[in-house]
Amino acid sequence: MEPSDRMERVPTGIENLDKKIGGGYPQGKGILLTGVPGTGKTIFGLHLLYQSCSDGKKCVLIATEESPEDLLEQAGMLGLKLEPFLENGLLSIKQVLEIRAGAVARAAHIVDGFNNTEIDLIEECELDRSFRHDQVGFNIGTMDLVDVVKLIPDDAKVVVVDNVGVLAFGLDIKQFRDKFDTLNRVLSAKQITVVYVMDDAAYQLTHQIADYSTHGAIKLFVKENPYTGKMERFLSIPKMRSTSISLDFILFDITATGIQLKGSKGKLIDVG
């Protein structure tokens, strides 16, 4: 697709990746990031948060698996120190815990432009009412996928949900599609740029249907490089609307300073 000159971009925090996607993630859109364990999914999200906070944007990290302490330690080891942004209010971390907790969240007074199914989901999850959004821990057992909206303040500009796949378990394919579509549309209506990290197990379990809901998709792999015989990390960008992209696989590494892209390798690996 031809790139749009009017599409604003949000830098990814990974310089060479920005060059591959027209300057960054499309602003106000949802991007799906999938991959098996060990491919660096969380690190991609940390790069985005560090860059966006450095640019003065209000950011939210919704963590469904790792603790804030572990995430902050991981970011610090890569030179992406996030603590100052927590202190000055540019970053907030919402941890979704498997504990009992009180009702949480915030208002989302938007129904214009949504279909009946989406409006039903919004009302079912009480997104049309006002709630607190300052609670630290949340009950993943009773939390709905669309409840993610409730955790995001009105002034947020960039959100990373890591791992949205955790919230997909227990849903059938139609339920997941309806809820994920609604979540993505509500956040896009608020002009929030979102990266949805999704583990490969949940991605396959939901028949890869999340690809159809988001504006873009980045897939991470660990495969044997036939030229070197070594197991290496690759990424592909099969979809990025309003952006001119290459379908070649891109070799990358995780270094002491985070993600480093090493160049395109064409279609040299079998990702099946």
Regions found by a protein language model. Give the residues of each.
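C-terminal regions of RecA-like/P-loop NTPase motor modules
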Residues: M1-S4, S244-G272
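Dynamic helix-loop-helix/coil hinge segments at AAA+ ATPase domain boundaries and subdomain interfaces
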Residues: P3-P11
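Pre-Walker A adenine-sensing motif
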Residues: T12-G24
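Short hydrophobic/aromatic beta-strand immediately N-terminal to the Walker A/P-loop
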Residues: G30-T34
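Conserved P-loop
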Residues: V36-S130
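Loop/turn-to-beta-strand initiation segments
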Residues: K58, G89-L90, D155-V158, A189-Y196
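Phosphate-binding/switch loop-helix module in NTP-utilizing enzymes
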Residues: I99-S188
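Phosphate-binding/switch region of NTP-binding enzymes
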Residues: I192-G258
